[in-house]
Regions:
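Bacterial N-terminal signal peptides that target proteins for export
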Residues: 1-9
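An acidic, Gly/Ser/Thr/Pro-rich helix-cap/linker signature
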Residues: 22-114
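C-terminal functional modules
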Residues: 283-340
Length: 340
């Protein structure tokens, strides 16, 4: 296991430290393991999961605080760009072309995995295109540093990130990942699909075997595609179900659109009563959510269906889900056009 190998190296180095060197608790330039919240974290991990206390402390001693991450997390919210501008960023000609090439390079795997999980291949490709430009940009922060920094030096979300740090330690134990070299985003998301440790452990699958150990989500493309498909499948993706539809809008002036709502709290019929006509033939009782999708020339709206909601479970943003859908359609069209 990677954990045991890394710990043997770490503990050997500690054993060879010269007399008078800083003790383990001092953690020079790192985290002070005597801090109450860190000591409590170690106690919990050891008692809940049976990990060796010395092993856990040896790994945490290697974590380095990252002030830049705290700066990113506390940065004032900038003016939100309009949807059309957000869309242009993610639907560049380059990203569409790269997506089509990626699809053709992995055509057989995409067909098999799409059939197995009943998720269209274009959505698997689009998610990877938006998350990491098809695996090219997976993050440069050490995951150990990122998670420890947010777990112990970022009070607003320390509970969430302590849980993810705990999950990362378990992932290290179960996989071949090296805790000292594994890199990811500033929030600790990993690999081509940008899975957090808890998601990695729960949804990552090996496409070609029944092995239970977590797969490589950086270079094993069958596992990467299967893991994204499995994630969407587990959240209830409906085969052949719609994702988005355009609208014709003449709304009731009293009708309020909730800008951050992702829940399917309307139906096609209820929207119709407020002057919103859905440009897709679906039953009137179909649950939907109305989404603002402003264009260069003014307001516009779309409706999201169940599969749209499923995409927001990957990233809780309506604009993200719209971008995934639009990139999926653009890449699929490019692939179709190139083969006709």
């Amino acid at each position: 296991m990677a954990l045991k190998h890394c710990l043997r190296v770490l503990l050997a180095a500690l054993a060879c430290s010269p007399a008078g060197a800083q003790p383990l608790d001092a953690a020079p330039n790192g985290f002070d393991l005597q801090r109450p919240e860190i000591a409590e974290f170690v106690d919990r991990v050891v008692s809940h999961h049976g990990l060796n206390r010395q092993d856990v402390r040896a790994i945490l001693k290697e974590a380095q605080p990252q002030p830049k991450i705290i700066e990113i997390m506390t940065r004032p919210v900038e003016t939100v760009t309009p949807w059309w501008e957000y869309r242009e960023h993610f639907l560049s000609g380059e990203r569409i072309s790269e997506g089509a090439h990626f699809w053709l390079d992995h055509k057989n795997s995409l067909e098999q995995i799409s059939g197995r999980y009943q998720v269209p291949p274009e959505y698997l490709v689009a998610i990877l295109g938006i998350e990491t430009k098809y695996g090219r940009v997976t993050g440069h922060y050490r995951v150990l540093d990122a998670l420890a920094t947010l777990a112990f030096d970022y009070p607003p979300r320390h509970s969430y990130f302590r849980e993810e740090l705990e999950q990362f330690l378990l992932l290290i134990k179960e996989s071949k990942l090296d805790p000292l070299t594994t890199t990811g985003s500033y929030a600790g998301a990993m690999g081509a699909p940008q899975f957090m440790p808890s998601v990695y452990r729960r949804y990552a699958v090996d496409a070609n075997s029944d092995k239970r150990s977590p797969p490589d989500l950086w270079s094993d493309w069958d596992a990467i595609l299967a893991s994204v498909a499995n994630y969407l499948h587990e959240y209830g993706w409906r085969a052949s179900g719609p994702v988005l539809a355009e609208t014709k809008l003449d709304p009731d002036p009293s009708f309020q659109i909730e800008p951050h709502n992702l829940e399917l709290n309307e139906t096609v019929e209820s929207l119709g009563a407020h002057g919103v006509k859905v440009e897709l033939a679906v039953p009137p009782d179909t649950p939907v959510v109305l989404i603002s999708a402003e264009q260069r020339d003014g307001p516009a709206y779309r409706v999201g269906f169940h599969n749209f909601y499923v995409i927001t479970r990957y990233n809780a943003s309506a604009r993200y889900a719209m971008a995934v859908h639009d990139l999926a359609q653009a890449v699929a069209k490019r692939v179709h056009d190139s083969s006709s």
